[in-house]
Amino acid sequence: MNVANRKWIRRLSWKSLRAARTRNLVAVLAIALTTVLFTALFTIALSINDGFQQANFRQVGGWSHGGFKYLTEEQFLQLRDDPLIQEWGLRRFVGMPVEVPFNKSHVEVGYSDPNQAHWMYCDPVVGRLPEEGTDEAATDTRVLELLGITPQLGAEFTLTFEVDGHETTQAFTLCGWWEYDEAVTASHVLIPQSRVEAVLSETGVTPPGADGMTATWNMDVMLKSGSRQIAQDLEQILEHHGYQNESRTAGDNYIDTGVNWGYTGAQLSENLDLPTLLAVAALALLIGFTGYLIIYNVFQISVTNDIRFYGLLKTIGTTPRQLRRIIRHQALALSLAGIPLGLAAGWLVGGQLTPVVIAQLDGVVSVVSV
C-alpha cells in the first residue's frame, strides 16, 4: 500500500467514523465537556482577576500603567515622545479646598488633559471637559452636592481652595459632570490649563511651590509593552534621557516615578520569587496534564474498541505510519467538532457563574473576561 496515498487514508478515516456514530458522538461530547470545564474555569479566573484590578484602579485613582511625578515643563516635553510610551496624559495639581463643606472630603483642583481625565474616571456623562481660555470647570456630582449646586450646564459657582498655602476664591461655569464613585479616593475639579496659570499668577506661586508639587507637570503613561514590566520600562525611559529615579542625592537628574500597583502583573513582577514561580508553573502543568489525560483516555477507549479493525488493516499491508495518520485524522475530526462547541458553551457557563462567584467576594468589581 502506498504510504503517500493520503486521499485513501482520509476516505478510510471518514468511513470508519461513520461506521461508529454513537461512539463518536460520545467522544465529541467528552471533548466538548472537557473544553467546557477548562473554558469556564479560565473565564471565571480571568474575570476575578479583572474585577480585582478594576477595584484596585479605583483605589489608586486611575488605570494608567505608571507615571513621572513633579516634572518641569522641559522634562515633560523630553519624556513624552519616548518610543516606549504608547500614550501619555498630563495632570497639573493646583490646590485643594479644606474648609467646610470639604473638610471631610478629598477634592483636588487642577488641569487634566482628555487622556488623563479618562484614566482617572473623569469622563463627563453630561457636557464636556473645560476649554482653554474660559472660566469653565468640570467635576463630579458629589462636589456639586457639597456646593449646593444643581447639575446643570452653564451653572455658575465659586470655590475657595488653598494653593501652596495661599487661599483663593475662584468663580467657575459648569461645563460638564460625571457620577460620583465612592470607590474612587479623590474627587476632581478640572479646569483649563490657562486658568491654572491665571490662579498661579494671582496667588504668586511659582511651580513647584514650597510643597514641591504645586502646578508641576505630572505625566501618566500607557506603555507599549503593557503591564508586565512597568517599573523597568519607566527606568529605561528615564535612562534614554539622562535621568534616574534611584537617589535624590545622586544629582539634579532625579525624577520620581510611580507604578500602578492595581495591575496584578505589576504586583507579580515585584513580589515574584522562586517558590511562587514554581507553584504557578506546577499549577499550570497540573491543569494542562489533567486535560490531556481526560482527552487521551477518551481516544484510548475509542482506539481500543477499533483494535480489531486496525489489525485487519495491518494484515492487508497498512503500515504503522498509515495507521497513525488514520487515527490523527479521526482525532482531528472529533476535536474540530467538540472543541468549538465546548469553547462556546464554556464561555456561556463561565459568564453565568462569574457574577455568582464574585458576589461572594468583597470589593471585587463584576467583570466577565472574553
Can you say where each PLM-predicted feature lies in the sequence?
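N-terminal Sec/SRP start-transfer signal
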Residues: M1-T39, N49, R328
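Juxtamembrane interface helices immediately C-terminal to a transmembrane segment
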Residues: S13, L17, V36, A40, ...
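N-terminal membrane-entry
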Residues: E270-I287
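Basic-flanked hydrophobic alpha-helices used for secretion and membrane insertion
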Residues: L46-Q267
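Small-residue-rich transmembrane alpha-helices
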Residues: L46, Y296-I301, R308, L332-S366, ...
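Interfacial "coupling" helices/loops that link adjacent transmembrane helices in transporter permeases
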Residues: T290-L334
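Alpha-helical transmembrane segments of multi-pass membrane proteins
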Residues: W14-T22, R321-G342, G346, G350
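Small-residue faces within membrane-embedded alpha-helices
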Residues: A32-T39, T43, A284, G291, ...
